[in-house]
A protein has these predicted regions:
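Intrinsically disordered, low-complexity cytosolic terminal tails
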Residues: 1-92, 161-168
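Ankyrin repeat domain, specifically the short helix-to-loop turn at the C-terminus of the second helix
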Residues: 80-92, 120-128, 154-173, 200-208, ...
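General structural concept
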Residues: 92-146
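Ankyrin-repeat boundary/linker signal
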Residues: 97-98, 131-132, 167, 178, ...
Length: 262
């Protein structure tokens, strides 16, 4: 049908509301389209239940990766349409495919700072917000490393909106998900040193400032060691809990100060 292809070359910088309405409509049409493949019908539910390391076998098409990297949201939906028809797969099967590193399309969009595509994916497939890659990183970990506060805000806000309607997200706080090193997204913000990104994650869940990674270091500890006064003052705005976990056998501040002196 022509209307599926007539907007393919419209840049994502076009009228802000029009792309959202247009692409959401096309995504809903794709969701409701049946593709004639027994394999696709049989694989949809099991794929959702796979662990991130098992998902690596479900490798996404390079055309999809390239479409995300390119950043044109209309072209992205067009490529989704092509892949569904070409491979006889449902849209959900397409979205549960990953890169060799276990990255979902949302990880890829966060990495390349493609805000419109990330919003579209999170809106239609919110369960990808808590999907981990082989390193245990969620899209929020990746977004934080990209140092793009808009992407970080988008992921946090989409999670807040979608959480109550999805059982698999209800008991999982996106801000508290730790990767293979035990680092939460807030740990990653301190490594990145981007104050705007730190504020986004910190104000979404400030209790994480005391969470220890596998090296027994909290975000507060890391901030002291890094010596950025602006970041440290921000993190010290909250009160210290009585049962504060110990960093290397000391309080976060004491442990960090000892390390700075050594």
């Amino acid at each position: 049908m022509n209307h599926n292809h007539s907007h393919l070359q419209i840049p994502i910088e076009s009228d802000d509301s029009s792309w959202r309405q247009r692409c959401n409509r096309r995504m809903e049409e794709l969701k409701n389209t049946q593709f004639s493949s027994q394999d696709a019908a049989a694989s949809s539910q099991p794929v959702r239940l796979l662990l991130h390391k098992e998902l690596v076998g479900k490798v996404m098409a390079h055309e999809l990766y390239n479409a995300v990297e390119d950043g044109n949201v209309d072209n992205f939906v067009g490529v989704l349409n092509q892949q569904c028809r070409k491979r006889k797969l449902s849209l959900s099967d397409i979205f549960y495919q990953v890169t060799g590193a276990g990255d979902s399309l949302l990880h890829v969009a966060a990495y390349h700072k493609k805000e419109h595509i990330a919003e579209l994916i999170a809106h239609h497939f919110p369960e990808l917000l808590i999907r981990r890659n082989v390193r245990g990183d969620t899209p929020l970990h990746v977004a934080v490393r990209s140092k793009n506060s808009n992407i970080v805000h988008l992921i946090l806000s989409q999670y807040a909106i979608k959480k109550s309607n999805h059982d698999e997200m209800n008991d999982k706080e996106i801000t508290r998900k730790a990767n293979e090193h035990g680092d939460t997204p807030l740990h990653e913000t301190i490594y990145s040193g981007d104050v705007d990104v730190i504020k986004q994650v910190f104000f979404a869940d400030n209790d994480v400032v005391h969470y220890l990674n596998k090296s027994r270091r909290s975000p507060l500890y890391l901030a002291v060691v890094n010596g950025n006064v602006e970041i440290l003052n921000l993190l010290l705005e909250i009160s210290f809990p009585v049962d504060l976990p110990q960093c290397l056998g000391n309080s976060p501040l004491h442990a960090a100060l000892l390390e700075r002196k050594s």
